[in-house]
């Protein structure tokens, strides 16, 4: 198999091991990037992941990722990483669900922040712990292709320790969906706010924003523009702040459902358009450093089925970014979700 590491392509092998009931699974990946543009200690890659009931763990060395080949979002990172986490479901009364998630991670010999691909570090060793509550109670009517009403929220606390300093962060999100009189169409208000305690010039004491977040070929969520740390119309990690408030208004338009477009081996299922506008304030607690950003844009998602079994989604998006009242840039996004 092929693996992406930073801007290079390597060769590797992946194996999955599972029990017959699917309670436990282990994934093992090994790869090598044959290029003279990387130091010798970055050409080898290894990763082991494991899951058992609510537990999950991972260990990696120079982590590589297949979808990094396509970009622009990169998951590959230099150095060692050891992670362990646990998900505990407190409420499971569908559609209501409340989860409590714990995560602990240790990094060594790193050169980039684990959660910000374009932010270099001044340290090589990092310990992080995170705990969060995640609640969802969203609903959709018969024939809908997306959630149409309800609420969801999250509250997360995180601590990062490097070079003898402990930097705490806390953030939360709140989403409210209101149906419109138009069938299968809703207005969503998506809010987020957070803050960190640390020096503004400390990379760990900042939140980073930018980009749609989708790769040209991907396996992740389709509508990543909804995530609080994305900001279509800007480069990935281009915007930062030690505290922030973000407000998005999204209008999900009625989907177009295809009844007989295609052939048995490949046919179109539906087309879902959406429009959005976002306002982001950073460093809101400091009047001298306070900045405001915004965007307007849209995304259309075309779902199609291959061989009656594989559902894929082709997404196209466009956004214009603003800093204050001035136009700051534009961004086109095209992404094919294959898994």
Locate the predicted segments by residue.
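Outer-membrane beta-barrel initiation region
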Residues: 1-51, 123-147, 238, 243, ...
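Transmembrane beta-strands of outer-membrane beta-barrel pores
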Residues: 2-4, 19, 30-36, 52-54, ...
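Outer-envelope beta-barrel architecture signal
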Residues: 7-11, 22-26, 51-57, 78-80, ...
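Feature captures outer-membrane beta-barrel proteins of Gram-negative bacteria and organelles
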Residues: 11-19, 40-60, 77-90, 127-137, ...
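Extended hydrophobic-aromatic, low-complexity segments
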Residues: 24-28, 257-264, 284-287, 308-312
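Outer-membrane beta-barrel translocator/channel fold
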Residues: 51-121, 189-234, 318-334
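C-terminal outer-membrane beta-barrel translocator/porin domains of Gram-negative envelope proteins
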Residues: 72, 119-275, 283-285, 326, ...
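Conserved, short, structured surface segments that act as functional micro-motifs
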Residues: 315
């Amino acid at each position: 198999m092929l693996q992406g590491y930073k801007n290079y392509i390597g060769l590797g092998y992946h194996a999955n091991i599972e029990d017959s009931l699917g309670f436990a699974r282990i994934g093992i990946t090994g790869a090598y990037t044959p290029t003279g543009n990387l130091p010798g200690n970055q050409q080898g890659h290894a990763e082991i992941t494991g899951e058992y009931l609510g537990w999950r763990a991972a260990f990696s060395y120079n982590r590589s990722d297949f979808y990094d080949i396509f970009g622009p979002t990169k998951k590959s990172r230099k150095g060692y990483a050891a992670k362990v986490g646990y998900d505990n479901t407190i409420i499971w009364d569908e559609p209501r669900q409340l989860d409590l998630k714990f995560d602990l991670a240790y990094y060594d010999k790193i050169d980039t922040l684990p959660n910000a691909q374009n932010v270099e570090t001044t340290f090589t060793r990092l310990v992080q712990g995170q705990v969060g509550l995640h609640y969802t109670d969203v609903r959709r009517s018969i024939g809908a292709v997306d959630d149409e009403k309800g609420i969801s929220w999250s509250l997360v606390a995180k601590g990062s320790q490097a070079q003898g300093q402990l930097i705490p962060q806390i953030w939360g999100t709140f989403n409210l969906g209101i149906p419109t009189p138009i069938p299968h169409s809703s207005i969503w208000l998506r809010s987020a706010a957070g803050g960190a305690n640390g020096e503004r010039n400390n990379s760990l004491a900042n939140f980073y924003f930018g980009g749609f977040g989708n790769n040209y070929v991907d396996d992740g969520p389709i509508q990543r523009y909804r995530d609080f740390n994305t900001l279509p119309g800007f480069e990935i990690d281009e915007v930062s702040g030690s505290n922030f408030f973000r407000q998005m208004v999204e209008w999900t338009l009625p989907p177009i459902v295809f009844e007989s477009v295609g052939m048995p081996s490949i046919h179109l299922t539906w087309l879902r358009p959406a429009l959005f506008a976002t306002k982001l304030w950073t460093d809101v607690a400091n009047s001298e450093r306070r900045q405001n950003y915004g965007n307007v844009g849209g995304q259309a998602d075309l779902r199609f089925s291959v061989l009656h079994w594989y559902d894929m989604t082709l997404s196209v998006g466009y956004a214009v970014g603003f800093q204050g009242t001035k136009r700051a840039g534009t961004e086109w996004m095209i992404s094919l979700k294959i898994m």
